[in-house]
Amino acid sequence: MKKEFWLTCISVCLLAACCEKESLPVTPTSSDLQFGHLAKTWDEGIPLGNATVGTLVWQRDSVLRFSLDRTDLWDLRPMDSIAGPNNRFAWVCEQVRKGDYLPVQKKFDHPYNALPAPSKIPGAALEFPLNIGKVFSVHLFLNNALCEVLWENGTKLQTFVHASEPVGWFVFENLPDTVSPEIIAPRYSNPDEVAGDNSHAGPALGRLGYKQGTIQKEAGTTTFHQEGWGGFSYDVVVRWQQKGGTLSGVWSLTSSLAADRADQETAEAMERGVEADYRSHMDFWKGYWAQSSVSLPDTLLQKQYDNEMYKFGSAAREDSYPISLQAVWTADNGMLPPWKGDYHHDLNTQLSYWPAYTGNHLQEGMGYLNTLWEQRDVYKKYTREYFGTDGMNVPGVCTLTGEPMGGWVQYSMSPTVSAWLGQHFYLHWKYSADRIFLKERAYPFLKDVATYLEQISTVDADGVRRLPLSSSPEIFDNSINAWFKDMTNYDLSLMHFAFNAASELASELGLADEAAHWK
């Protein structure tokens, strides 16, 4: 009897251990997103990401769909219309003085709308052909960066994007039938595609002129390969295995701009296993949430704050590209993304990274600063060609690699963009007190900005420093009225900040002459 008793106990313990492995442990909060059904459009899907890859969990028609994205999926063909003899701020100023602004719009604005690229491009989607009835719960656990979906028949899905690896995991429990995930490729072969939603969609993907990519299927593995412009390509791989009613699998999306390879990433992930990957995933998120917290008496504001901090943690990393317009959640509607999914430095990137400072997430904010620092040569070339000065300004609308894209030049090629970007170097120094960063990054960046601003501006008879023309983002759209002869508060405040900050940092470094000069 004793032997049978202990064998029974051991069996129960082993069964319990197996059950624990099936469900990944989660910690709910009052700020979690919870719904009674899956979203019906991509832009309302549950977002998961790690600043390099991301997914949106939603339902297209009646099918569960993961929209897969990666930061460095870009068509980087040059914006030829910007080049040429009139690619000069002085020419824009002259056209404004003459009251003849249509040539400016034709050169910088019209091509941005008319040409499909340069542009961010989408990755692909995963669909799961389930026939299991109605969903009754969709839950995004903020603490765990995990989405859980429950069906009325008892099926459960748990899915997460690994916090530090370019992979996403999915685990289904209690499936009544065998299920194989399917990769759904973007429709690059249809130039006449029309968006089926009310998003600010761009042109059809087919206008890029790509040959439709290839999908290869093997037992437990599917691969999608897509060629892009100029030798660029990307790959999506999904691997899975099903044992009884449990289906577990992993996907990866990689590009030719990085060393990652989707087939290798997924194979290595399957070797590690979902439990091990979830533990290392949680190591990041536990540390992330421990960095800071805010308690608000208004529950709606508390939920909004917590959700925004979750979004920041999903879109920012030290070794990632900065947060673009849609971050790692590019539109999944057969079209190019709204505003080409580019980098808007007129306020979008700046505001996206403010939580890094008071929120005690300086490490995550470094992805922004590292990219700005590494692209200085591109910015200085743009500054010499367009503004005709030394120092450094930055395009207000630019590609992954920092090249200008045109658009409404009052903000897409604004004369004060780099001043606001310089503030982030200043803030990192103030919050970190890192003197190496001050000496090697913050002051050199702001010195280049101040040098440019000094040369692009003039001092009038009253001793007041002025820009040739001034603007403020998006007021009066792209009309001639969006330019002002008097300095706007926007430009004035940015120039004041840039010179004062350059002086302060020079003084901190003991550079008295330079501090006095910028003062």
Go through each PLM region and give its residues:
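Bacterial Sec-dependent N-terminal signal peptides
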Residues: 1-25
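Acidic/polar, glycine-enriched structural segments that form the non-catalytic walls/loops
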Residues: 19-44, 48-342, 361-366, 372-381, ...
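Beta-strand segments within the central parallel beta-sheet cores of soluble alpha/beta enzyme folds
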Residues: 28, 32, 325, 367-370, ...
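A conserved hydrophobic secondary-structure block that centers on an alpha-helix together
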Residues: 152-167, 178, 187, 415, ...
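Extended, well-ordered alpha-helical scaffold segments
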Residues: 300, 304-307, 364-375, 437-453, ...
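Alpha-helical support elements that line or immediately flank enzyme active sites
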Residues: 311-314, 349-363, 419, 425-435
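The feature captures the catalytic groove of carbohydrate-active enzymes
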Residues: 327-342, 390-440, 454-518
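Active-site cradle of extracellular carbohydrate-active enzymes
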Residues: 369-372, 376-404
